[in-house]
Amino acid sequence: MPRWGRGRRRKMRMIEFIPYARHFYPALPRFGPPKPPIIMTYEEFEALRLVDYEGLTQEEAGKRMGVSRGTIWRALTSARKKVAQMLVEGRELIILPQGNEVIKSDEE
C-alpha cells in the first residue's frame, strides 16, 4: 500500500471560529520591493484566539481543539511570531485553512 507524504498523518483540529476578516495589509505601502505575505493557518489562529483572547490555558485550549498541549504551544508560538512579524515589517497577513480542520457546530 503506497504512503502519501512523510511521517504520521496530521490529526484533525477542531475549529470553533472562522475569522470574518482573513486578509490584513498595511494602510501605507512599504518603500522598496514588496515582501511576500505571511500565511497563518486556521489552527494557529484558533490557538491564538483561545489562549490570548479567551484566556484559556494551553491545556484547556488543547482539549477544545482535540490536540495535545504541545501542539497548542507550537501553533501559538508560530502565530505570535507571525503577528509580530506583520506589525514590525509592515507585511500582509493572510489566514487560510490547511485542510485538516473540522468546524465545530454549536450543537456539539
From Swiss-Prot:
Gene3D superfamilies: Winged helix-like DNA-binding domain superfamily/Winged helix DNA-binding domain
One Pfam family hit: DUF134
NCBIfam families: PRK04217.1
Family statement: Belongs to the UPF0251 family.
Protein name as it appears in the record: UPF0251 protein PF0620
Originating species: Pyrococcus furiosus (strain ATCC 43587 / DSM 3638 / JCM 8422 / Vc1)
